[in-house]
Amino acid sequence: MVTVLDLVNQGKRERHPEKAHRPDNVVLKKPEWIRVKAPVSRGYSETRDIVRSNKLVTVCEEAGCPNIGECWEKKHATFMIMGEICTRACAFCNVSTGIPTALDPNEPENVAKAVKQMGLTHVVITSVDRDDLADGGAQHFAEVIQAIREATPATTIEILTPDFLRKEGALEVVVRARPDVFNHNLETVPSRYLKVRPGARYFHSIRLLQRVKELDPTIFTKSGIMVGLGEERNEILQLMDDLRSADVDFMTIGQYLQPTRKHHPVIRFVTPDEFKSFETIGRTKGFLLVASSPLTRSSHHAGDDFAKLRAAREAQISARA
């Protein structure tokens, strides 16, 4: 069966040589509730042309996002800065690993130009991990934010960052640039980190999110996880509590989909009813917003969700008055 991943990655370079030594894993047949349209619309083509003309990289393509057809049709895209090669090799991720190239000094301007051309009212900026850089790419993030502010002042900006592990002062640089939403994904529960996200540290990520709120309480904080990686339900509920202890506003929960046979296998497909229950529980735990469904991804419907976040915060402030 041809999938969206096949169409997106067709004709591209060979991916994941660092995973070539791993044994093949079984790819489970997807259930009926995980179905997406192939990306063939006119809007999709126009978005692709804008991305190409500005020499930009998107996580939509690099990560093989199943929602690329829907989002690009609406001219929504998540720009991935600092190149297309990551310094880490997470077992779930479709982004290539290796030795990255030097930062492109024109990238901030090119991203801002694309945001203006696409008429975006809300933009999401993410990046590969750049452990090779002294600041993990923090200053580059700040320059991209500044360039967008100058080109389209009304556009709200959401960033999805790496963990800046062992990069002292990096987080402060990014927060001073004042993004509207600071997202850093936990990805999975702590018991799965060694197999799924071995280069990261769970409680460092929790502390990172907490520190954002300490530095600037007006910035919305956000984090997401994938399910179906072998986690237990009670572990997800504990993770929710950990995020709330860090005063995180918004949580996303989506189904893990295995990019290739060399990636971590899908242990099971979580049902839509289970996703709905996670959303309900998350709201009772105090999140301003919870997005939970099989195809939920960090940047999916990000603009609409930002409007909901603002409304929820305003309602919360009014209730306390």
Swiss-Prot record:
Class of this enzyme? transferase
Subcellular location per the Swiss-Prot or TrEMBL entry:
Cytoplasm
Q: Which GO terms describe its cellular component?
A: cytoplasm
The record's InterPro entries line, in alphabetical order, gives: Aldolase_TIM, Elp3/MiaA/NifB-like_rSAM, LIAS_N, Lipoyl_synth, rSAM
- Sorted alphabetically, which NCBIfam families does this protein's record hold? lipA (TIGR00510), PRK05481.1 (NF004019), PRK12928.1 (NF009544)
* PROSITE patterns documented for this protein: RADICAL_SAM
GO MF terms here are:
4 iron, 4 sulfur cluster binding; lipoate synthase activity; metal ion binding
Q: What is its EC number?
A: 2.8.1.8
Similarity section:
Belongs to the radical SAM superfamily. Lipoyl synthase family.
Name of the protein this chain belongs to:
Lipoyl synthase
UniProt superkingdom:
Bacteria
Q: Which UniProt keywords apply?
A: 4Fe-4S, Cytoplasm, Iron, Iron-sulfur, Metal-binding, S-adenosyl-L-methionine, Transferase
Required co-factors:
[4Fe-4S] cluster
Task: Describe cofactor binding as the record notes it.
Answer: Binds 2 [4Fe-4S] clusters per subunit. One cluster is coordinated with 3 cysteines and an exchangeable S-adenosyl-L-methionine.
Write out the pathway annotation from the protein's UniProt entry.
Protein modification; protein lipoylation via endogenous pathway; protein N(6)-(lipoyl)lysine from octanoyl-[acyl-carrier-protein]: step 2/2
Taxonomic lineage: Bacteria, Pseudomonadati, Pseudomonadota, Alphaproteobacteria, Hyphomicrobiales
What residues bind [4Fe-4S] cluster 1, as annotated?
Answer: 60, 65, 71, 299
Pfam families linked:
LIAS_N (PF16881), Radical_SAM (PF04055)
